Amino acid sequence: MKEKRGRLTFPINGEALHVPDSTYLACPRGHEPVLRLDDARRLREHAIDLYRSKYRLLSSEEIRSIRQRFGLTQGELARLLRLGQNTLSRWEAGRNVQTAAMDVLLRLLRDVPGGLEYLRKHAA
């Protein structure tokens, strides 16, 4: 197997995203790329970043910043948004992408005064 770099396709939410400059192994007999675990992880994270950029979703850093701005733990924000803590953790780590609806809710929390208090009152 020989290491190569090139454009690979990765599906995010049913959409095939073309990720440039990806590292993979090429088998001389086969046509399918072979990915090492670290390369596959980087490919997925890069595809998620491309998806977020394409649809103008908050980045993982922006999501973390919103949570930290209010002094919340991942568990506290997850409860307010009615999510599992692991889901929020994956968004912040760039391993999964939030839905458009959750993106809007996070933006409202960030941009609308009193949003946190409203969620605290009505999330239970």
Report residues per predicted region:
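Extended interfacial segments that mediate partner engagement and assembly in macromolecular machines
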Residues: 35-101
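Short, Lys/Arg-rich amphipathic alpha-helical interaction segments
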Residues: 90-124
